[in-house]
Amino acid sequence: MTHLVKKTYLRSMKRRIKKVAVLGSGVMGSRIACHFANVGLEVILMDIVPKEANDKEKAKNLSIEDNAVRNRIVNDSLTFALKSNPSPIYKKTFAKKISTGNFTDDLDKIKDCDWIIEVIIENLDIKKSLFEKVEKARTPGTLITSNTSGIPIGLMTDGRSEDFKKHFCGTHFFNPPRYLPLLEIIPTKHTDPEVTAFFMDYGQRFLGKETVLCKDTPAFIANRVGVYSIMALFHIVEEMGLTVDEVDKLTGPIIGRPKSATFRTCDVVGLDTLVHVANGLKGAAPNDEKKETFVIPDYVSKMVENGWLGSKSNQGFYKKVKGEGGKSEILSLNLNTLEYEPKQKVKFATLEMTKPVDDLLKRLPMLIKGKDKAGEFYRKMFFSMLEYASNRIPEISDELYKIDDAVCAGFGYKLGPFATWDVLGVEATLNQMKAEGYSPAPWVEKMLASGSNSFYSSNAGSKTYYDIPSKSQVLIPGADQILDLDIIRESNTIWKNSGTTITNLGDGILNLEFHTKMNTIGGEVLAGINKAID
């Protein structure tokens, strides 16, 4: 859910985006360009000029003076992106919306662009040098943003004009941009509030994003909490002696997370990328009480040294090989020996016990109470995440719902930390955490003392959250403009059976939901349809 105030929403409609310049054509830049093309925008994608012609180009009598050579980097990057799987573009014909160029010859073309987004190497000096050139070419009033994930946004505009600073902020897309909905908006102290409001609205309405307003803190919101959780899990796995197969079984759909779970997700993201973010956090957040968690475990360091980075190197925590008869087989890494072994079936009593339970909200409390190794793992994993998230307020966000929104949209979780805590029971979980040596933020106890026993509630069909300064439940901004079926279902269900639910949306409108597997139509669904028509 994106949270917008009506007044802000209306003001932001004054500006229109028709053409975008994407500066940097790497993995993120090329895919961001594709997503802009997906929504019908004209895009110019640029990158640096190669130092010299390569052997293939020389064989064709091409030199560094030829456009084919000068635009080789950007053209190769775009071609690679368009061939990648999953595809970053809706239809191949949409790629015609993207033209290419280079910083040396074509930077003046940004004068016709409505939005300029920088997506180059994570080096502050190089970014500032590019922005100096951009300022000379851009039209005053043009929006300018950075997709950085690790450099403070406020440092990038040193030496830039007032107009540049006023129209500059961070716009952090998550990879792959077409598929992951999170877009973090990070204004600086100089950013015009209307620019911030515009991006919050534009990302939601035109780019299909979950826009989350962030403070300019290390790694912003989603990566700060999400990467911490992954790093904490790495250490828990080492401590408990769990296998790659076991962890991915425990941390996938069964707890409301993607099928890629933990280690497969790391392979997709790239272990080098994850290590880069973790090392960056360790240095950029020296006062973080959990900074030691960002220290890379030995088995991860050795994998990086070996070049086992995941999908990009064809092996990471998993490796695909040709088995007997030429059939492909997926091997998983033994974290102790660092040798690849056939995948093993995973069985835990706690998982067997919860197999019949389809409802995630009922399943999670059962999992965390497990008496076996799986239950112990869940307690360690969830308690560390809840502890860390609670202590990041107000550092990374003043409002707890922003942390949940960012983590869910950025990592594909069905429940963020605070929604998870509500499901587990706030007071009971808090007491258990303290008994096991965890130190959740003091404001959680104060919340319970104030009479609020949950982080979220509902009021007249709209979702509220616990506001720490006022010690009260407050309407989530924009919640009154959104129909939340989870809330409406609680009080406005007028009929249901095993396959359908009928709820009253007001204004003479009924909503009919299907609950059957794959939405198959059987007797229960037909009965629901007939009841709704009656």
Predicted segments with their positions:
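N-terminal glycine-rich phosphate-binding loop for ADP-containing cofactors
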Residues: H3-L4, L10-D534
